[in-house]
């Protein structure tokens, strides 16, 4: 119970995860998103960080752990097919794409716009929250990207 309160109060505030409630992903771009997925993202982080704190593991595991906590719905969202049922359990990750908190859907969502990912914002988030260094301002002569034409794709 105390570890759960610390995760909810410390980790969610530190990583701005309370902002998840205010994000409404574009359903045309992210059709698989639903409110149940948001709650699964939150629970994954609570269980993951709570495990690290309760086991008195190295704080570095927040960034480097090769496991997470999943139920069937979240596993399918992540492309992992061998998890069955609604209860969350610790799952070893076999890929090189998802490590620690930075690979969780909640952190990826809070560092994205509703209609696209944002590597620059994600990088600034890492600098501010994990390195304690705010990013420098852009040089004054940098122009904005042109508007994307309606219906254009990459």
Where are these regions (language model features)?
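Active-site substrate-binding loop specific to GH73 endo-beta-N-acetylglucosaminidase modules
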Residues: 1-154
